[in-house]
């Protein structure tokens, strides 16, 4: 089906372009969302008449998105989740979680605007793209931790898994020293008895 794009659509084209798309994509997504019109002669003439209005509306929404982008770009948000000792999350962090934490901090972000390239299933710092407008994307960081203290450690550049490994090695060293002390005390008692 031939359609006229009423706004920029990713991987499809710019506003005003006549493109050929599959019928289902046009009927189920582009037409109901108001992103396109069927490319008939009447619609092409109607679009030409409304082109300036659509362009100014697009410029306004892009300007609003750029204002939000200036404040939002590079922000770090903390998400507290339960996780195993190895750092694997019980569940995963979803776009909804990212949007909710951004909204709690006072940013206007919708769930559908958050783009995760892969599911977040581990503790740590993760970069996430936020698609504010067809022409405006920003990157935010999600600091996924078990507690606020862990989040601060991760933010300072320390890995929770490395810290846990160091603590475990220190504990094993203390246990080995304790057994050495017990073993030498037992030998001293045996020598004193002889």
UniProtKB/Swiss-Prot annotation:
One GO biological process this protein is involved in is:
translation
Function, as annotated, reads: Binds to the 23S rRNA.
Q: Which family does it belong to?
A: Belongs to the bacterial ribosomal protein bL9 family.
> Which Pfam families does this one have?
Ribosomal_L9_C, Ribosomal_L9_N
Whether Membrane counts among this entry's keywords is no
What is the recorded name of this protein?
Answer: Large ribosomal subunit protein bL9
Could you tell me which species this protein originates from?
A: Paracoccus denitrificans (strain Pd 1222)
Q: HAMAP family of this UniProt entry?
A: Ribosomal_bL9 (MF_00503)
Tell me which InterPro entries the record gives. Answer: Ribosomal_bL9, Ribosomal_bL9/RNase_H1_N, Ribosomal_bL9_bac/chp, Ribosomal_bL9_C, Ribosomal_bL9_C_sf, Ribosomal_bL9_N, Ribosomal_bL9_N_sf
- What terms describe the molecular function in GO for this protein? rRNA binding; structural constituent of ribosome
């Amino acid at each position: 089906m031939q359609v006229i794009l009423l706004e920029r659509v990713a991987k499809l084209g710019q506003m005003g372009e006549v493109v050929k798309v599959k019928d289902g994509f046009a009927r189920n997504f582009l037409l109901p969302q108001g992103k396109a019109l069927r490319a008939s002669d009447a619609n092409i003439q109607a679009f030409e008449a409304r082109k300036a209005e659509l362009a100014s509306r697009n410029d306004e929404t892009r300007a609003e998105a750029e204002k939000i982008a200036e404040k939002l770009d590079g922000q770090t948000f903390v998400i507290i989740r339960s996780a195993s000792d190895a750092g694997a999350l019980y569940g995963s962090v979803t776009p909804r979680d990212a949007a909710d934490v951004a909204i709690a901090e006072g940013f206007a972000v919708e769930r559908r605007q958050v783009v995760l390239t892969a599911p977040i299933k581990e503790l740590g710092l993760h970069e996430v793209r936020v698609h504010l407008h067809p022409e405006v994307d920003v990157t935010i960081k999600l600091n996924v931790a078990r507690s606020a203290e862990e989040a601060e450690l991760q933010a300072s550049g320390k890995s929770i898994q490395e810290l846990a490994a160091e603590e475990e090695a220190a504990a094993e060293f203390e246990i080995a020293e304790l057994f050495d002390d017990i073993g030498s005390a037992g030998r001293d008692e045996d020598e004193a008895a002889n």
